[in-house]
Amino acid sequence: MLAGSVPVDRAVRVSVTASGAATQLSALLRLVQRAQEHRPRMARAADRIASWFVLGLTAVTIATYIAWRSHDASRAFEVALALLVISCPCALALAVPAALAAAHSRLSRLGILVCRPDALETLARIDTCVFDKTGTLSDGAWHVRDVQTFGQVTTAEALCIAAALERGSQHPLASAFRAHDDGREATLASQQAGFGIAARVNGRELRLGIATFAADRADDGALWLGDGSSALARFEMEETPRPDAGPALAGLRAQGLTLHLLSGDSTDAVAHCVESLHAPFASHAARQLPQDKLARVRELQSQGHRVAMVGDGINDAPVLAGADVSIAVAGGTALAQRSADVVLLRPDLGSIAAAIDTARRTRRIIRQNLAWAVGYNLVALPLAAAGMVVPWMAALAMVLSSLTVTLNALRLARVTSS
C-alpha cells in the first residue's frame, strides 16, 4: 500500500515500511528533480551557442573599437559600448529554458510529471503510440461473470482459493476476488508475468492464470485454477472500458499518431475492448508477454517510427523502458512509474494528448525564440557597429529582445488543449 492510498471497501491495518523521503511519492518527486537538474539537449545546445556568441562578440567589439579609433576617436568608446549593450546573448540563453519552464508549469497543472530531461523533446517527435489494455484503456475493475468447477471444489471454495492466491498481487484481476477472501493462508507465492500466480494453499501447490499454466490445457481466454496438471475451476472474467478511453484515442489520432494495442489478455478480451471503444488501432495483439511487447516496439522503431508506450503494470516495465518515450498512467504499479519518462497523476487519458500538444507547442516556441534571438542580433549588431545606435537605445533594445523571448514562452502557460 502506497502512502496516500484510500481503502475502498474496508478498514485496514498496515505496517509502515517507509516514511518521509522513502515513500513512493517522494521517489517520484526525486526523479522529477533529477530531470530538472539535468539540462535537456536543446538547452545545452543553446548554451553552447551563447558561449560562442559571447566570444565572437568580444572579438567584434575589439575590432570595432580599433576601427573607430582610426575613423573617429571621440566616438570609439560610445560605439563599442553600444555594441556590447545591444547584443543579446540573454535572448539566446533564455530561448530554451523559458519555454521549458512554462511547459513544465502547464504540465504540472494538468497533473503530468516529466521525469526525464529530454522527454518533452522526444514526445514532440513521436508518430506512434502503443497501449496496454488492462488498467490503461479499461478501468481495471474486473468482475467474475461465471464460475465452472470440476468436482474437486465448490464454487465458493474456488473463489476463496483464488482470493488467497491473489491477495498480495497488484494485478487488476486481483480486485475481482477480494470480496471472497476468507483469510486462508497462501504461502510461497510467486508471479510469472503473462502466465499467472502460484502459491501453496491448504498444503497444496496451486496456480491461477491462463489454462496452459494452471491446468495444462489449451488457452481459451478464461482464468483457470489448477495444480499445473489438472483443473479445479474456470473463471470467465469481464471488465469495463474506461469512459475517457474512446475520446482520448480519437484525440491522438487527430494529432496524426498511429495507434497499436498490445495486451496480455485473451484474444476475445482484446477484440471486445477494440469493438467497445470503436478504437482506430492500426494493429492489436493478444497474449503478449513482456518480451513480446518489447520486441514489437523494437520492430516499430526499426521501421523508423518514434514510439510512445502507455502502460500501468509490472508487465509493462520492460517495454516502458525500451520505448522512445514512456507514459505511466495514474494508479499504476510503482515499477511502471519508476520506468516511465512521463507519469500521469490523474486518471485522465486525455492528458496524453495534452502532453503531446504541449510538447509540440514547446518545440515550436523554442524555434521561434531562437529565430528571434539570431535575427535580432543579425540586424542590431551591424547597426550598432556602424554607429547608428546610441547606448541608451541599445539598452532599451536589449531589454525588449529578452522580454520578447520571455513573453513568447509564457504563451505556453495560457494555451488550452483541445
PLM features per residue range, with description:
Residues 6, 78, 88-165, 319, ...:
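Conserved catalytic phosphorylation-site environment of P-type ATPases
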Residues 51-87, 111, 276, 371-397:
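Helix-interface capping motifs at the ends of transmembrane segments in multi-pass membrane proteins
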Residues 18, 38, 203, 227-368, ...:
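Conserved ATP-binding TGD loop and adjacent catalytic N/P-domain core of P-type ATPases
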Residues 144-257, 267, 279-297:
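P-type ATPase nucleotide-binding
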Residues 345-418:
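Membrane-embedded transport module
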Residues 1-81, 242, 358-365:
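Actuator/coupling domain of P-type ATPases
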Residues 49, 53, 80-91, 310, ...:
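Hydrophobic transmembrane alpha-helices
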